[in-house]
């Protein structure tokens, strides 16, 4: 019966493709077994892939066919519950087994009727990402179904939440007298409608006995010798990497001048890390990575900046598998600005571990101590500030590393006083700000809110109330993940227990603006940009406070010593723009009175992986290209900008004219600017500019405008285009960093993406992608 239903669905999709004019690509299905039908689907999709460049209807139909293939590979509920490979935890399995009929009636049947059709028609990339990556591969080539996938996540969180007094009643739509199934249905629906998109480790491992569920791990082993650093790397770092977590590790304390007996210092440790990452990723479908944090006064700074790509000086110490981030004090930019204003002989001094106290300081305390150490002659060498700046920019542009973060902004706007015990680094993707030390890791559990699901139809508008409810649900969901999660080592468990840090981000900001008819950097879009951030921070903090006030839970450890307990809110450190009349004063008083269950709330991460299942733009970034192309082992994978394709179909009722426009776009790498020249501000296609065509200053300013309400940080990538002669404007990149510094941002540069002048379809400056934090 199930095979016949799927066969009929395939037949209906094939008929639609024929009606769209693609009969010559198709042989009608005559398959008599599931295996034959799966092979048939694979053949048809392979034939039609190239056509998706011109017809979004084919792209969506191919996605539906892949969903049929997923259904052909799926197993019964009984087989799924008892699968040794899936290995559900006993609590989750028992919770589902005891309510199977109730779950089927109240959750699964409504999903298949109401939500699944929209999910199945999102597109080819979405379907393939679920099939290849997120759905658990079971015995004999079988696959977890989408019903089972969403149920695993929702049931795991529900099982934890219903055991917390009164917490479930904080979920929108849940009242006193609720049942386990009521709560599970809310989470299931939020996941199935893609309102909440959990991080990759959560989707892969939550509810299972195997795998760790956190995305980001921050470490500072405080290693002052190579031996101690090696022990830290082969211990905790290796353990986390094998659990597929991404690592940000501060190695600033390993700051030795080379001697006869110790000639390589930090370089040798970086090489060990590089080899470890390469080995762990060599047989893994989900690669992870490491970002090493040092401050720009480290004695090995210039050597570290020559360990990747074409800048490598010594092949023995090539480290192309890891990244570096400069944890940069304000003093560096103050000196560079002094140089720009005409000051002569502006120097930057490098120190060894005799100046280790600088690692623990920030702000004025750092500056005064740095100046004193310079006067005392403890510097190892001095370099013209412009030479250091150029070396940093050249390395970022050519190799994609270093990233750059602002040490003082991160510490100044942290919820604890860190003077004398400063935060020393961030995570792999530069959006998490937590204190780590030799005894405790910083750990963050991530999820993003898909902004496109907050759009109301006819006429299209952004529903702030919907965002508010989703933000509240996400807080409860992630706290359930924290309670149920697996973590790879004791120091990670300690970090989770003490801080209960959440990292709630967004995805689909550009797509949302497109559907509203806004250019991403237009005034209406910039206003919405701030409203989204403010409402999310307010609602997440309010929900966390109510977990203490209404739910009776204890605040996070250290709350009484935190700035929160004294009435501080993150936006107090900024010149805040607000477009919403929210009762912040009342919330401030309530936090002082009742506390916060969680210590942190918002972190705007890249959503490279999960944005593929939602078919929307990544994070808060502009769309990179209106026709994304990726070559894989199975061939070229195309992902068109469906909003542009839909708009072209609406604009051109004549198919011949529409195809003519698409051919023009094809010849110009799908750039509307290159294809059609100077478009008027009111032209409907102007808003389809890509990341490299936006003024980067506007994108930095948008990050700055929402920064007061982002209590962690934002993975801000810069998109730079080569000049026609193939040169990269280093001053352009440096000016953007200065702009970010002056705006008080915490992250100045995640990736620096360079588009080649010779081929506008190519990127450079960082080909590796983090899928740990990238959701």
Swiss-Prot record:
<feature type="site" description="Important for electron transfer">
    <location>
        <position position="750"/>
    </location>
</feature>
<dbReference type="Pfam" id="PF02867">
    <property type="entry name" value="Ribonuc_red_lgC"/>
</dbReference>
<comment type="similarity">
    <text>Belongs to the ribonucleoside diphosphate reductase large chain family.</text>
</comment>
<keyword id="KW-0067">ATP-binding</keyword>
<dbReference type="GO" id="GO:0009263">
    <property type="term" value="P:deoxyribonucleotide biosynthetic process"/>
</dbReference>
<dbReference type="InterPro" id="IPR034717">
    <property type="entry name" value="HSV_RIR1"/>
</dbReference>
<feature type="binding site">
    <location>
        <position position="246"/>
    </location>
    <ligand>
        <name>substrate</name>
    </ligand>
</feature>
<keyword id="KW-1251">Viral latency</keyword>
<keyword id="KW-0244">Early protein</keyword>
<dbReference type="GO" id="GO:0006260">
    <property type="term" value="P:DNA replication"/>
</dbReference>
<keyword id="KW-1272">Viral reactivation from latency</keyword>
<keyword id="KW-1015">Disulfide bond</keyword>
<feature type="site" description="Interacts with thioredoxin/glutaredoxin">
    <location>
        <position position="773"/>
    </location>
</feature>
<dbReference type="InterPro" id="IPR039718">
    <property type="entry name" value="Rrm1"/>
</dbReference>
<feature type="binding site">
    <location>
        <begin position="215"/>
        <end position="216"/>
    </location>
    <ligand>
        <name>substrate</name>
    </ligand>
</feature>
<comment type="subunit">
    <text>Heterotetramer composed of a homodimer of the large subunit (R1) and a homodimer of the small subunit (R2). Larger multisubunit protein complex are also active, composed of (R1)n(R2)n.</text>
</comment>
<feature type="binding site">
    <location>
        <begin position="606"/>
        <end position="610"/>
    </location>
    <ligand>
        <name>substrate</name>
    </ligand>
</feature>
<dbReference type="InterPro" id="IPR000788">
    <property type="entry name" value="RNR_lg_C"/>
</dbReference>
<feature type="active site" description="Proton acceptor">
    <location>
        <position position="427"/>
    </location>
</feature>
<feature type="site" description="Important for hydrogen atom transfer">
    <location>
        <position position="444"/>
    </location>
</feature>
<feature type="site" description="Important for electron transfer">
    <location>
        <position position="751"/>
    </location>
</feature>
<dbReference type="InterPro" id="IPR013346">
    <property type="entry name" value="NrdE_NrdA_C"/>
</dbReference>
<dbReference type="GO" id="GO:0005524">
    <property type="term" value="F:ATP binding"/>
</dbReference>
<feature type="site" description="Interacts with thioredoxin/glutaredoxin">
    <location>
        <position position="770"/>
    </location>
</feature>
<feature type="active site" description="Proton acceptor">
    <location>
        <position position="431"/>
    </location>
</feature>
<feature type="active site" description="Cysteine radical intermediate">
    <location>
        <position position="429"/>
    </location>
</feature>
<dbReference type="Pfam" id="PF00317">
    <property type="entry name" value="Ribonuc_red_lgN"/>
</dbReference>
<keyword id="KW-0547">Nucleotide-binding</keyword>
<comment type="function">
    <text>Ribonucleoside-diphosphate reductase holoenzyme provides the precursors necessary for viral DNA synthesis. Allows virus growth in non-dividing cells, as well as reactivation from latency in infected hosts. Catalyzes the biosynthesis of deoxyribonucleotides from the corresponding ribonucleotides.</text>
</comment>
<keyword id="KW-0560">Oxidoreductase</keyword>
<dbReference type="InterPro" id="IPR013509">
    <property type="entry name" value="RNR_lsu_N"/>
</dbReference>
<feature type="binding site">
    <location>
        <begin position="427"/>
        <end position="431"/>
    </location>
    <ligand>
        <name>substrate</name>
    </ligand>
</feature>
<dbReference type="GO" id="GO:0004748">
    <property type="term" value="F:ribonucleoside-diphosphate reductase activity, thioredoxin disulfide as acceptor"/>
</dbReference>
<feature type="site" description="Important for hydrogen atom transfer">
    <location>
        <position position="216"/>
    </location>
</feature>
<feature type="binding site">
    <location>
        <position position="200"/>
    </location>
    <ligand>
        <name>substrate</name>
    </ligand>
</feature>
<feature type="disulfide bond" description="Redox-active">
    <location>
        <begin position="216"/>
        <end position="444"/>
    </location>
</feature>
<dbReference type="GO" id="GO:0019046">
    <property type="term" value="P:release from viral latency"/>
</dbReference>
<keyword id="KW-0235">DNA replication</keyword>
<protein>
    <recommendedName>
        <fullName>Ribonucleoside-diphosphate reductase large subunit</fullName>
        <ecNumber>1.17.4.1</ecNumber>
    </recommendedName>
</protein>
